[in-house]
Design a protein with these regions (language model features):
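Short, electropositive alpha-helical surface patch
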Residues: 254-260
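Acidic catalytic motifs of isoprenoid enzymes
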Residues: 1-185, 192, 196-233, 241-251, ...
Length: 278
């Protein structure tokens, strides 16, 4: 369930593209500094969005460090990067999320890939849990509850998506301060959107494999596509409403690009593939 919170590159100018890339590379750099090369395997667009959001909201509360250099992914060409205080938090959350997700894949599906990834990230995840016990405990609790609902074959969309929404709400609540209500709202509705879009995207594959998907029954009902579109629009509207209440200035246009356009890219791509050509 990663890789949905992405920028719409086609709608960004060169400066905005460069700023996104420096944030993405800055997060990768901090993951590597805190958790080594194996930690870099957890780099995602989703946590880059959280880093951009928190760095913008808490701009000025910590130094923004910039630089350029080589890395294992770019050993020849120098790349520019930037990071601030929230970046280290996002680096830890990136490792923790992927660790617990891998553990669930092993426990639920006996996925050897999940087991291998869990073992690989065990030490970094424990380090992250020591620094952020509240958030890491929430990840574990929410994923356990979600796994139980999925094992029961639940098709209560609000319940199953709400588990992942609650997880994301806890992650977005960085400092438990006066911005917490809006941050939790963004995380909650974005998390529900991610979970349901992932189920929507995987439906045909899951049906072919006989795997669990909460949309299986609903997908056979008249008006399924229209209902899913309405659900996605409602969740993102609530997410955007909470974002607009935050005093974000730095990278605000980049954040809006992601929230208003980028998050729709995979949905639009699926629609384009399924629309018959005239």
């Amino acid at each position: 369930m990663f890789g949905y919170v992405i920028p719409n590159q086609a709608a960004l100018d060169d400066e905005a593209k460069a700023r996104y890339r420096t944030a993405y590379c800055g997060l990768c750099r901090r993951i590597g500094a805190l958790h080594g090369l194996r930690g870099r395997l957890t780099l995602s667009y989703d946590l880059t969005f959280l880093d951009l959001l928190l760095s913008s909201l808490y701009e000025g509360e910590s130094e923004c460090v910039t630089g350029s250099g080589h890395c294992p992914i770019h050993p020849i060409r120098k790349i520019n990067w930037r990071h601030s205080g929230p970046t280290d938090y996002c680096a830890d959350m990136s490792v923790a999320l992927h660790y617990y997700n891998a553990a669930d894949k092993w426990n639920d599906d006996r996925s050897l890939l999940g087991l291998g990834f869990e073992k690989l990230l065990d030490s970094p995840a424990q380090t992250a849990a020591q620094r952020w016990p509240r958030q890491c405990s929430a990840i574990r609790t929410c994923l356990d509850r979600l796994a139980q609902l999925e094992a029961e074959g639940s098709e209560d969309l609000d319940a199953v998506s709400g588990c992942f929404g609650e997880l994301m709400a806890k992650l977005f609540d960085y400092k438990q301060d006066h911005w917490s209500p809006e941050l939790r709202s963004i995380g909650f509705h974005l998390g529900k959107f991610i979970y349901l879009l992932d189920a929507y995207d995987d439906l045909a594959r899951d049906e072919k494999k006989g795997a669990y998907n909460p949309l299986r029954t609903l997908s056979r009902q008249p008006g399924y596509e229209e209902e899913m579109r309405e659900i996605f629009e409602l969740l993102l509207a609530r997410c955007a409403r909470s974002f607009e209440r935050l005093p974000c200035v730095e990278d605000a246009d980049l954040l809006r690009n992601i929230l208003y356009s980028g998050v729709w890219l995979k949905y639009n791509c699926k629609q384009a593939k399924e629309t018959p050509k005239k």
